[in-house]
């Protein structure tokens, strides 16, 4: 076995040992085909008020600008599909499944740090950085290049065996490895279930999302008042949205995760969120992704969906 084969085997085994469901590897190169797509998306203001999306254009397209001497992008998938959904009846306030438990940034980042540590212990001098939705990395595009799946019409990564309820993460390292074949087939075909189900018409042609219309954007990223145009369209989502994933036929293959940290927080079972004080919110959701919207944003979302129903 060659050194490069041995190193690749160590990477794949370490990913499995740390609980990652899928691991693929791509060469760290410039994403030339993505440059015009990203530029077009930004020029059409599909990023809404997310000004940071226009920053670090070159770094988004070239991992070697993030990690000096980068040779490989290790793409990872970690399942978060719950054992049981929280109350999603018609009048229940709803939050995205990824926010049921602890903040994935903390949980996955800890695993990634351990990953890099393991590589250094087994291989020796390995330099790199770890990423989980926290830097200008085009994670879905890298996952496709690493053979983990294809980009669906809802722009999410779809895996033929397991669907889309996964966190994506990356290690960008200066270690040459054996690269996986990229996914070159789109298995969505003529299906338009996600497009048809989106209540705000955020899903466009060519696997594009108008982020400024997406319920996840409106309830998390948007810091000002939610425009009245969206009244009657939120379907009681107060943090994120899973509609386009819930209707996707590929998610019939989703299996419950085994990560204790992602089990629902006890207070998520309660329905009196609109009466929650700022102090209680900060205490209860200290390690939750819900804190991203802050108490003020959470209350804004609740009042918006409550008022749109009246």
Curated annotation (Swiss-Prot):
Enzyme class: oxidoreductase
Residues holding [4Fe-4S] cluster 2: 198, 214, 241, 244
Binding positions for [4Fe-4S] cluster 1 per the UniProt entry: 188, 191, 194, 248
Swiss-Prot/TrEMBL catalytic activity: epoxyqueuosine(34) in tRNA + AH2 = queuosine(34) in tRNA + A + H2O
CC cofactor note: Binds 2 [4Fe-4S] clusters per monomer.
InterPro entries membership: 4Fe4S_Fe-S-bd, 4Fe4S_Fe_S_CS, QueG, QueG_DUF1730
Pathway: tRNA modification; tRNA-queuosine biosynthesis
Recorded family membership: Belongs to the QueG family.
NCBIfam families named among the record's database cross-references: tRNA epoxyqueuosine(34) reductase QueG (TIGR00276)
Descriptive protein name: Epoxyqueuosine reductase
Organism lineage string: Bacteria, Pseudomonadati, Bacteroidota, Cytophagia, Cytophagales
């Amino acid at each position: 076995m060659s050194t490069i084969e041995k190193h690749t085997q160590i990477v794949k085994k370490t990913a499995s040992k740390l609980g990652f469901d899928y691991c693929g590897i791509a060469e760290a190169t410039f994403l030339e085909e993505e440059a015009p797509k990203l530029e077009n998306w930004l020029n059409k203001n599909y990023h809404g008020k997310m000004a940071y999306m226009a920053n670090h254009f070159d770094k988004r397209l070239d991992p070697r600008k993030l990690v000096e001497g980068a040779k490989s992008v290790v793409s990872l998938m970690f399942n978060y599909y719950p054992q049981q959904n929280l109350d999603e009846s018609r009048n229940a306030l709803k939050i995205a499944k990824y926010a049921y438990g602890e903040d994935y940034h903390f949980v996955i980042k800890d695993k990634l740090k351990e990953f890099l540590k393991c590589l250094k212990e087994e291989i020796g001098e390995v330099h790199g950085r770890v990423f989980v939705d926290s830097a200008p990395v085009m994670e879905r595009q890298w996952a496709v290049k690493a053979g983990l799946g294809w980009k669906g019409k809802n722009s999410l990564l779809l895996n033929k065996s397991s669907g889309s309820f996964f966190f994506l993460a990356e290690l960008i390292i200066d270690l040459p490895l054996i690269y996986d074949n990229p996914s070159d087939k789109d298995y969505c075909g003529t299906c338009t279930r996600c497009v048809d189900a989106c209540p705000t018409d955020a899903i466009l042609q060519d696997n594009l999302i108008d982020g400024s219309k997406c319920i996840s954007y409106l309830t998390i990223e948007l810091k000002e008042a939610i425009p009245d145009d969206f009244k009657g369209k939120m379907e009681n989502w107060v943090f994120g949205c899973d509609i386009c994933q819930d209707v996707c036929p590929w998610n019939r293959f989703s299996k419950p995760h085994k990560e204790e940290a992602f089990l629902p927080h006890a207070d998520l079972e309660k329905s009196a969120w609109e009466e929650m004080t700022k102090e209680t919110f900060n205490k209860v959701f200290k390690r939750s992704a819900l804190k991203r919207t802050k108490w003020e944003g959470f209350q804004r979302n609740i009042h918006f969906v409550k008022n749109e129903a009246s």
